[in-house]
Amino acid sequence: MPVLQIRKIGDPVLRSKAKPVTEITKKTLSLIDNMVETMYQAEGVGLAAPQVGVSKRIIVVDTGEGQGLIELINPEIIETEGKDIMEEGCLSVPGQTGKVIRASKVTVKGLNRGGKEVRIRAEGFLARAFQHEIDHLNGILFIDKVVRIGEEMI
């Protein structure tokens, strides 16, 4: 599986809303496999298709917290709960981090690689990773959400 080039801030694909996957083909599955390989090679915890130059609604996540690899097609957040602030970084924004307020718990709905709908209830770091990657599908980068001094009261 080839490792894909990770697009960096300034690339227009990172600021575009990704298109839904309408059919899961061999090409789709190959893209997912290559995204997984790229994420692990880059030592990331998540990757969205736009980060490798593909404007499709696909994410892969593995926070290393024991839940294993999660691959989602057309993911969407359907429920949120609570708020939390935490430092974030991004493979597409190298060398920069910042504190971001996000929901502490989320329920995410999407399709697995077999086309079956799945719902995942996540909290903590996994919930944050889902929100970060789904933001990528909407052309949003974490730096757009970094809190400024005085905004940290949640």
From Swiss-Prot:
It catalyses: N-terminal N-formyl-L-methionyl-[peptide] + H2O = N-terminal L-methionyl-[peptide] + formate. One of its GO terms (biological process) is co-translational protein modification. InterPro entries: Peptide_deformylase, Peptide_deformylase_sf. The active site is at E133. One of its GO terms (molecular function) is metal ion binding. Fe cation binds at C90, H132, H136. Binds 1 Fe(2+) ion. Its cofactor is Fe(2+). Its EC number is 3.5.1.88. It comes from the Bacteria. It is an enzyme of class 3 (hydrolase). Keywords: Hydrolase, Iron, Metal-binding, Protein biosynthesis. Belongs to the polypeptide deformylase family. Removes the formyl group from the N-terminal Met of newly synthesized proteins. Requires at least a dipeptide for an efficient rate of reaction. N-terminal L-methionine is a prerequisite for activity but the enzyme has broad specificity at other positions. HAMAP family: Pep_deformylase (MF_00163). This is Peptide deformylase. It comes from Halothermothrix orenii (strain H 168 / OCM 544 / DSM 9562). The lineage of its organism: Bacteria, Bacillati, Bacillota, Clostridia, Halanaerobiales. The gene is def.
